[in-house]
Curated annotation (Swiss-Prot):
Glycans are attached at residues 73, 177. This is Neuronal membrane glycoprotein M6-b. It is a multi-pass membrane protein. The gene is GPM6B. The keyword Manganese does not apply. Belongs to the myelin proteolipid protein family. SMART domains: PLP.
Amino acid sequence: MKPAMETAAEENTEQSQERKGCFECCIKCLGGVPYASLVATILCFSGVALFCGCGHVALAGTVAILEQHFSTNASDHALLSEVIQLMQYVIYGIASFFFLYGIILLAEGFYTTSAVKELHGEFKTTACGRCISGMFVFLTYVLGVAWLGVFGFSAVPVFMFYNIWSTCEVIKSPQTNGTTGVEQICVDIRQYGIIPWNAFPGKICGSALENICNTNEFYMSYHLFIVACAGAGATVIALLIYMMATTYNYAVLKFKSREDCCTKF
């Protein structure tokens, strides 16, 4: 029979080793988390959600403003309405694609991070796995370049609405308010090319323009376009993070797959 103190000491040692084993297991699991891909996924989901949601509503508000104030004849802006409707459907596709693509990239990040850090014993990776990682690197680069174009394109309506808003601020200013020159301050939406030059009225001046700026459609569309542009910028940043993470992981996988590899990055 062992003394009670020795038995208690052995139990405490076993419990300590068990706690230490759980702690080491948790640290090992946390070491396999691809934090860069995780941050990029959250940022990508947020950016795409802002761009798609706000952009969809802002486009609908833009059509309402054009129909009510700048182009009363439906045939003059029929093509623009079809293009905007098509863009709204494209937005649905973008949201669905990036939701799936973000999850796939996050899963690929878990795989490559675990392989790079050799969390599962001896390092093993297949040629197919490296090929898939290389494909994601190429696809992410292509999407990054494409989203730079989307980001630039999303700034165009912000510029247009800002010009209209700044013109309204000039009309509201004390220097011009109440003078006869107010009615000569105009905004011609036809100069942006979104409606033809024969569209009527196409140009709004003075107090009528000020009334447009005071409508809820203009206020909401303007600010939603700003948020959509910011969402596109956030998506570009997320794709840049994806690029760095996937490129690094692919380079390490490619390097460590060589038989003469004897060092680590």
